[in-house]
């Protein structure tokens, strides 16, 4: 046994594919529907989707080399794309049989197998290089084939995509608000945190005082977690209405 990590993840992946549903099918969105496993969707040429999983299982028993880890990365990426494609094709077939009201969603098996594919790919990338930038590129490129598959329209019959189409405007508005909050807090944190980090690193005299202040500041999220900031924030929002417009209100 050469790589216990890949072997364990592959065995779990095969177990998830055999025991859990890949997609859930419902005649409409008012009923829960039933799970459909890989065995019902794999037929004919689709059986070739099993080859990447079998390849991963075989490679976990051979001596590891950079070339073999590259093959593991490609197999995990191909399997992930294949699972997504199969779910989309299954949704298209079920929609053709049942009409526009049917709903086909990802099942627990898909989510678990997708997560395991990403873990296998991350393990391979970590073995291929220790450079953080190259690791980020290796893990980031996993999403490119998925984005192309999404843009091709092969996934349009999945309930997730149908819901997105019906509520695209709301989705884009919420996404914009979340990104504004994210970068609106990240930017000042970086502008303040990076200079303070340099000061703490270079000046032993300022370090204790800065750490004392920062330790007090970092307790604020814990205080907010227990709802102890609801009353002060509500008072501030009542005193200065412009704070309410920025999202400050009855929240911890």
Where are these regions (language model features)?
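N-terminal, non-cleaved signal-anchor transmembrane helix
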Residues: 1-177
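Membrane-water interface segments at the C-terminal ends of transmembrane alpha-helices
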Residues: 173-252
């Amino acid at each position: 046994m050469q790589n216990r990590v890949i072997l364990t993840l592959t065995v779990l992946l095969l177990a998830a594919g055999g025991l859990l549903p890949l997609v859930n099918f419902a005649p409409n969105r008012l009923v829960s529907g039933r799970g459909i496993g890989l065995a019902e969707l794999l037929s004919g040429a689709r059986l070739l989707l099993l080859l990447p999983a079998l390849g991963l299982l075989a490679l976990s028993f051979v001596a590891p080399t950079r070339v073999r880890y590259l093959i593991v990365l490609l197999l995990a990426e191909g399997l992930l794309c294949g699972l997504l494609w199969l779910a989309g094709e299954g949704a298209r077939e079920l929609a053709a049989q049942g009409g526009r009201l049917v709903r086909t969603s990802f099942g627990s098996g898909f989510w678990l197998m997708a997560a395991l594919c990403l873990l296998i790919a991350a393990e391979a990338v970590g073995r291929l290089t220790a450079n953080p930038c190259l690791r980020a590129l290796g893990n980031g490129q996993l999403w490119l084939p998925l984005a192309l598959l999404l843009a091709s329209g092969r996934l349009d019959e999945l309930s997730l995509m149908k819901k997105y189409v019906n509520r695209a405007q709301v989705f884009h508005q919420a996404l914009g608000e979340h990104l504004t909050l994210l970068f609106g807090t990240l930017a000042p944190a970086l502008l303040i945190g990076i200079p303070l980090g340099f000061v703490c690193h270079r000046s032993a005299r300022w370090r204790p005082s800065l750490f004392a202040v920062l330790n007090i500041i970092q307790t604020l999220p814990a205080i907010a977690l227990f709802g102890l900031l609801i009353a002060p924030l509500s008072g501030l929002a009542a005193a200065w209405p412009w704070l309410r417009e920025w999202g400050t209100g009855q929240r911890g």
